Amino acid sequence: MHAYTAVIERCSDTNLYVGHVPGFPGAHSQGATLDELHANLREVIAMLLGDGEPKLNTEFVGIQTVVVD
């Protein structure tokens, strides 16, 4: 079993959920619902893993809120 952290945003133009796995080339997708996005990400990641385990370019560390005056 493989586990990856996905970053998810909502596109204001299309109202779709858009997700990507940081540092995993090609691991991105979209969906009308979070469940659809999750299924789509699982599908694309499984397909990419068919080429072998990726060497991730980056490591997800976390998020921060930045306040600017």
Residue ranges of predicted features:
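Short, charged, surface-exposed hinge/linker loops at domain edges
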Residues: M1-V7, D35-D69
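Short aromatic-glycine-(Arg/Gly/Cys) micro-motifs in beta-strand/loop hairpins
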Residues: E9-V21
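A short, exposed loop/beta-hairpin motif centered on an aromatic-Gly-Thr core
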Residues: P25-L34
